[in-house]
Amino acid sequence: ITDLHQGIIWGTHTPQTERDERLINRFDYDGDYGTVLNRFLMQAAIGYPLTVHGTGGQTRAFIHIRDMVKCVQIALENPPAKGDRVMIFNQMTETHRVRDLAELVAQISGTEYALVPNPRKESAENELHVSNDTFLSLGLEPTKLAEGLLQEVEDVAKKYADRVDRGKIPARSLWTSNQAEGVPENA
């Protein structure tokens, strides 16, 4: 048995999807279910302040869609031997605190970011200690956010900015009655 623990997938294209626009990957940006990176990129594309919940000290793991596909291939080609323990792979290539991710997107896009109340009941700061050494030792050559492919998803956000439902961007589902919506004052 092989168990893949997956980080947040970013990116919209693989070599196969680049052949036909109809094959593009989903790009969920809403505040409740979309990924934080997609939300930041869509906010930047429409001039909406990037919303960082709480302190933004929550650490998340990320992996580009091409690397995710490669990791599945590597896992399939390297199964555990019969009778061995479950093989666990961490399917991620890097980790970032949410506020650092906001700073990266703000720097690339020229957008501001705002700290807003955290609508979730979670620690204000956390460290994510995770390793993908097994994938690296089996040939994964990771794609990092800062290597320019982030431009790929920024371009997708800009291309479809006219389709954005601004009301879906803020996180409005509250985890407890003590939480507040994640809406910036100037949005």
Residue ranges and their predicted role:
Residues 10, 14, 37, 57-59:
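Short, flexible micro-motifs
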